[in-house]
């Protein structure tokens, strides 16, 4: 068995069966079953779902959507990613799989917006996301240039 990696998930019934393993593990708002079923019905080949397989089973997943800021009152201008529904099966939590998914998204080098769910604020803080509060609610943002500057400063020290 090779080292697990992040991959784009296919929109098919096998993935739908894999998603059923996550049902009941987390909060209802993390459920992706309906979203995946809608994509199967629409025959959408451009999957927004990413995951990590380990031992042939899906153990972690997230949704990534490319967006453009259309006047929303927050600090991202232009194109950015919305990271939704990051979830790792209980037996695989605290082993770096959630961080692998986020680092995959960071590697695309777009700003990222996400909403912290279920006591996960510390996770986003650890990954250099900044909290943002607006009248509609709170969320976290990561900027590629902030991360690149931090690496450059560390390398020069």
UniProtKB/Swiss-Prot annotation:
Domain of life: Bacteria
InterPro entries for the chain: Acyl_CoA_acyltransferase, GNAT_dom, YlbP
N-acetyltransferase domain residues: 9-146
Single GO MF annotation: acyltransferase activity, transferring groups other than amino-acyl groups
Keyword entries, A-Z: Acyltransferase, Transferase
E.C. code: 2.3.1.-
Acyltransferase among keywords: yes
HAMAP family in alphabetical order: Acetyltransf_YlbP (MF_00824)
Record NCBIfam families: PRK13688.1
UniProt-recorded name of the protein: Uncharacterized N-acetyltransferase BA_4060/GBAA_4060/BAS3772
Natural source organism: Bacillus anthracis
